[in-house]
């Protein structure tokens, strides 16, 4: 499944909506998606949203859409 992960670049500051960023990744579960991001970045994860159906189609039309892959 594809997940959209909303995050802040650092855990040092409190989250601010204006500085929230996102990435897309493929994982088996939401827990696996969180683990991938936590193990490979210093990001402060705010929310993980599963994408499927019309929601995924909409996101894929965004020019910023690309799947993030981490080296294992």
From Swiss-Prot:
Gene3D superfamilies: RNAP, epsilon subunit-like (3.10.20.730). Its EC number is 2.7.7.6. Keywords: DNA-directed RNA polymerase, Nucleotidyltransferase, Transcription, Transferase. It comes from the Bacteria. Transmembrane segments: none annotated. It catalyses: RNA(n) + a ribonucleoside 5'-triphosphate = RNA(n+1) + diphosphate. One of its GO terms (molecular function) is DNA binding. RNAP is composed of a core of 2 alpha, a beta and a beta' subunit. The core is associated with a delta subunit, and at least one of epsilon or omega. When a sigma factor is associated with the core the holoenzyme is formed, which can initiate transcription. This is DNA-directed RNA polymerase subunit epsilon. It comes from Lactiplantibacillus plantarum (strain ATCC BAA-793 / NCIMB 8826 / WCFS1) (Lactobacillus plantarum). The gene is rpoY.
């Amino acid at each position: 499944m594809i997940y959209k992960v909303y995050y802040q670049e650092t855990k040092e500051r409190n989250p601010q909506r204006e500085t929230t960023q996102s990435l897309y990744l493929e994982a088996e579960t939401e827990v696996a998606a969180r683990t991938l991001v936590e193990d490979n970045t210093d990001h402060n994860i705010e929310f993980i949203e599963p994408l499927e159906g019309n929601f995924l189609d909409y996101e894929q039309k965004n020019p910023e859409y690309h799947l993030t892959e981490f080296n294992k």
